[in-house]
C-alpha cells in the first residue's frame, strides 16, 4: 500500500518497480538523527541508538499490508505502551523485534523519497529527484518550487 498524504508529490512513474523490490517498509530517510537518542532514552534503553533505523518516514511510504497486519496482531500491546509516531514504531521497534521485517537501506530510501533537507538529499542522491517527496511545503520550499517548475508545475 502506498501511503501518500496530501502534502506529497510523485515525480516518477516507478510504483511497480518499488513494489517489486520486496521491502516490507520503505519511506524517505530521516536526515536529522537527534530524535533517535531521545527515542532510545525514552525507552530507557540508550544502547538502542546503535540499532535504530534512519529510514521510514511514514507520510510517503510503501508498506506490505500482510506483514503489517501480522505484526500488528503481535505488536499491539507494545505499540499501545509507546507514544511514538507509527512510522518510528514500524521502522525501529518492529525491525528490532522481528529482524526479518525488511526495511530499505538508506540509499534506496533516498531514491524512494525526500522529506528533511531536500537539497542535501538531492546531492546525496547524485543530483537525482526521488520517486516522490513528503512535506514539501515545510522543508525548503524554494528548492521544491524549482523542481516542480522543471516538471511543468507552478505552485
Please annotate each region the language model reported:
Residues 1:
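Short aromatic/hydrophobic "clamp" motif used to bind/position activated sugar donors
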Residues 4-5:
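Active-site acidic Asp-centered loop
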Residues 8-47:
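Conserved donor-nucleotide/metal-binding helix-loop-beta segment in metal-dependent transferases, i.e.
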Residues 50-155:
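Catalytic core and acceptor-binding pocket of nucleotide-sugar-dependent glycosyltransferases
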Amino acid at each position: 500500500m502506498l501511503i501518500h498524504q496530501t502534502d506529497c508529490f510523485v515525480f516518477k512513474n516507478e510504483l511497480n518497480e518499488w513494489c517489486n523490490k520486496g521491502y516490507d517498509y520503505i519511506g524517505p530517510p530521516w536526515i536529522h538523527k537527534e530524535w533517535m537518542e531521545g527515542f532510545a532514552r525514552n525507552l530507557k534503553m540508550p544502547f538502542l541508538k546503535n540499532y535504530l533505523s534512519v529510514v521510514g518516514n511514514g507520510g510517503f511510504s510503501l508498506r506490505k499490508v500482510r506483514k503489517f497486519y501480522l505484526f500488528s496482531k503481535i505488536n499491539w500491546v507494545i505499540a499501545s505502551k509507546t507514544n511514538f509516531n507509527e512510522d518510528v514504531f514500524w521502522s525501529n521497534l518492529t525491525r528490532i523485534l522481528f529482524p526479518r521485517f525488511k526495511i530499505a537501506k538508506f540509499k534506496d530510501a533516498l531514491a524512494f523519497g525526500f522529506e528533511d533537507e531536500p537539497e542535501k538529499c538531492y546531492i546525496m542522491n547524485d543530483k537525482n529527484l526521488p520517486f516522490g517527496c513528503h512535506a514539501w511545503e515545510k522543508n525548503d520550499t524554494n528548492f521544491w518550487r524549482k523542481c516542480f517548475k522543471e516538471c511543468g508545475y507552478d505552485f
